[in-house]
Amino acid sequence: TDHAKKLEIEILEDEAKGITKTEKYFQVELKSGSCLEAKTVIYAAGASHRRLMIPGSKKLEGNGISYCVSCDGAFYQGKDAAVIGGGNTALDDALLLSEICRKVFLIHRRESFRGAYGTLKLLEKKKNVEIIRSTEVKKLEKRGREIQLFLDSGRELTVHGIFAAIGMQPRTEILKGLVNLDKNGYIQTEEEGLTSAEGFYGAGDVRAGKLRQVITAAADGAAAATAAARYILEHYQ
């Protein structure tokens, strides 16, 4: 932010609610009601965690349900926790929690996991980890400082915290019909972030098929900015 201010780049605290392409420019409609006209657009809105859609989960958000083990895992040292999910994040979360929690339940709705086989084998050897397959959580109830999980098998579990790792949702709803998206809603891009709409670039977690880390997002931004600047020089001089 400081770097942008030094370069006298205007920073708007607003939200884009729609983007359209005219013959020569992009029209960016803002939530405040104003509209911006741009020669190019770099779209880097990121992705958010998919929320649990279980009866009782909404009121437990931030009060027993977390989406970040590295942020909140330490609060459950010596306590019981549940991880819901079947990908790499779920397996990694369960492995990390197994080092600090008394008991970890890893719950997956399918029989097989999508995550790394090696991590799964490590979890299977952990005495304080119970892997529950082909099972869904039907309801959650807060009871004092504990949370009751009601499983579709009829079993009930009691934990102090729940970590959800059921995937990410890219913030690309406003791009439908403007650029090509994959089946999960991520932007399909070329090497420098160029999309199917000439002059429109994607960067960071909105891009399809890439490692989702801060360092790769920063690299995406640099590549897209360079490409966008070159596009303006080539088309508007």
State the predicted function of each range.
Residues A38-K39, G78, V159, A197:
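Active-site acidic short loop of glycosyltransferases
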Residues A4-L30, C35-A38, E99-E191, R230-Q237:
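A Rossmann-like FAD-binding core segment of flavoenzymes
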Residues G85-G87:
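Glycine-rich Rossmann-fold phosphate-binding loop(s) that bind the pyrophosphate
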Residues A94-L95:
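Generic hydrophobic/aromatic pocket-lining and core-packing "Φ" positions
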Residues G64, K79-D80, K103:
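Residues that mark the start of a beta-strand
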Residues A90-L91:
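N-terminal Rossmann-fold NAD(P) dinucleotide-binding loop
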Residues S48, M53, K58-F75, I166-Q213, ...:
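FAD-site-proximal beta/loop scaffold in flavoenzymes
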